[in-house]
């Protein structure tokens, strides 16, 4: 559509963590912010206090959202054109609001609007606990052996880390 997009995490990693987006016709900018920023958050309402030094404080806790501290997203588009954001989040236990499971990962179904902005599928911006699954067919993943006696001449592909191609 002629735009370059930039997706950012704002608000630190605390309760007002969020995902924001900007776009520009030039990769070097200037970028205009999405008028509906943040596009994914756990904070009530569209407006929030950015760069608040108390971003870790529970004053931003939203009791209406199971997922808290939602931010740092990655864009995923399926071969069917479905769009998702995968992001960090936490699920605190009340009343202390401690996140004993640490940082977790969640997924949100998204869509592109006619005016070229990314939105959650339901036009809200609060991270959802459940989303509609993809229409992609299941793809069986080969099972990784549970035992290896290393008697072969080469290591199996499962020993290689991402971005390191086997020779």
Please place each PLM-identified region on the residue numbering:
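Carbohydrate-active catalytic/glycan-binding domains of CAZyme proteins
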Residues: 1-167
């Amino acid at each position: 559509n002629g735009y370059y997009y930039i997706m950012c995490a704002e608000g630190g990693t605390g309760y007002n963590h969020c995902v924001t987006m900007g776009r520009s016709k030039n990769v070097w900018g200037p970028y205009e912010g999405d008028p509906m920023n943040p596009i994914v958050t756990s904070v009530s309402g569209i407006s929030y206090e950015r760069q608040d030094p108390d971003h870790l404080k529970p004053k931003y806790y939203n009791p209406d959202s199971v997922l808290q501290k939602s931010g740092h997203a990655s864009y995923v588009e399926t071969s069917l054109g479905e769009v998702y954001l995968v992001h960090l989040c936490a699920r605190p236990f009340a009343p202390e609001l401690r996140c004993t499971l640490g940082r977790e990962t969640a997924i949100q179904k998204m869509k592109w609007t006619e005016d070229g902005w990314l939105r959650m599928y339901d036009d809200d911006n609060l991270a959802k606990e459940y989303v509609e699954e993809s229409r992609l067919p299941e793809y069986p993943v080969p099972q990784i052996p549970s035992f290896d006696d290393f008697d072969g001449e080469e290591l199996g592909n499962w020993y290689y880390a991402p971005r390191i191609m086997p020779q």
